[in-house]
């Protein structure tokens, strides 16, 4: 777990999850670690800890996972991404991407402030609070740091 993370009540974070610096995990969030959960093997004998391979959820720096969301391992959540409350994440989430729903789908882009960005041109977005400009390059949002 990185520095300055905030983990809210009732969150369940299973190893080998990794949290970057400044991550927010909302109340009741679940980060899973078993891609193919079963109580028994094909012979109906109880699975042992050696009978499965853990896979984790990796949450990038500054990202937020909203209340009651479930992230199904293995997934990577990019830096500064925002997962809307109650979402079920089954795929990787890009940096600054906003996803919502079940399954979680692209719903826009957010900036460092966590606010949805306003489109100001075909490939540019602006934060309504900080006025920072972000650019869409090859399907990924980038911040140039010029503001």
Where are these regions (language model features)?
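Short, intrinsically disordered, charge-biased short linear motifs at domain edges
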Residues: 95-101, 110-119
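Cys/His-enriched microdomains
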Residues: 106-109, 125
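Short cysteine-rich clusters marking metal-coordination/redox-active sites
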Residues: 111, 127-130
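Short, non-ligating residues that shape and space the ligands of small metal-coordination modules
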Residues: 119-121, 133-137
């Amino acid at each position: 777990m990185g520095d300055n993370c905030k983990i809210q009540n009732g969150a369940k974070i299973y190893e080998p999850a990794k949290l970057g610096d400044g991550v927010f995990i909302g109340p009741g969030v679940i980060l899973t670690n078993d891609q193919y959960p079963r109580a028994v093997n094909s012979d109906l004998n109880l699975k042992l800890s050696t009978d499965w391979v853990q896979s984790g959820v990796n949450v990038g720096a500054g990202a937020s996972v909203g209340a009651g969301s479930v992230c199904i391992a293995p997934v990577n959540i990019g830096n500064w991404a925002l997962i809307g409350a109650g979402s079920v994440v089954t795929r990787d989430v890009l940096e600054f991407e906003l996803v919502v729903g079940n399954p979680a789908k692209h719903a826009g882009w957010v900036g460092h402030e966590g606010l949805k960005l306003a489109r100001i041109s075909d490939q540019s977005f602006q934060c309504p609070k900080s006025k920072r400009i972000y650019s869409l390059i090859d399907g990924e949002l980038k911040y140039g740091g010029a503001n």
